[in-house]
């Protein structure tokens, strides 16, 4: 059966850290034909530009697995939570375009791993705020949530 397990897992070394270093956005569909081998993207035939955002602190990626025994379905909900400090008119414009589209999102961790969110269906902005903050130490910037179901 194609769903049978093929391996186990030993307890890994404690040599990793949490957090996201950078986020890269590619407009939906610009990747062209994507070749995936062994759960890794090995090639993309499209001509594309990626737009990089540096992040630090309150940004994360979480993948939720949803299975239905009754329906025989399984899908993966990928949720990216981002915090961008400092409100700017340039960012207002770009984040509005991001909310209108459904980009592919590449999440680069502090461990050097890069994970793709929304490879097949893109990622939608499902929530966000532009906040000035109330106190001197509060966030003046943006929070954004992108969600992909694959």
Regions found by a protein language model. Name each.
Residues 3-4, 9-79, 123-136:
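Solvent-exposed edge beta-strands and adjacent loop segments
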Residues 68-90, 138-150:
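Oligomerization/assembly interface segments of phage tail-like spikes and tubes
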Residues 79-83, 110-129:
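Short acidic, glycine/tyrosine-flanked loop/strand segments centered on an H-E-D-like triad
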Residues 89-92, 130-131:
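Short alpha-helical segments and helix-capping/turn motifs at coil-helix boundaries
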Residues 93-117:
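Short, acidic/charged, Gly/Pro-enriched secondary-structure junctions
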Residues 118-150:
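Compact mixed alphabeta submodule
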């Amino acid at each position: 059966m194609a769903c049978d397990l093929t391996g186990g897992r030993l307890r890994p070394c404690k040599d990793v850290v949490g957090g996201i270093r950078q986020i890269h956005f590619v407009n939906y569909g610009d990747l062209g034909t994507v070749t995936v081998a062994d759960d890794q993207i090995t090639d993309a035939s499209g001509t594309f530009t990626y737009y990089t955002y540096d992040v630090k602190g309150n940004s994360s990626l979480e993948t939720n697995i949803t299975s239905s025994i009754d329906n025989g379905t399984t899908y993966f909900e990928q949720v990216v939570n981002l915090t961008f400090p400092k409100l700017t008119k340039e960012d207002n414009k770009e984040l509005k375009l991001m909310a209108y589209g459904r980009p592919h999102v590449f999440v680069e961790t502090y461990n050097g791993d890069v994970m793709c969110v929304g490879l097949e269906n893109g990622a939608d902005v499902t929530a966000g705020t532009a906040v000035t903050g109330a106190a001197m130490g509060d966030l003046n910037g943006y929070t954004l949530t992108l969600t992909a179901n694959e």
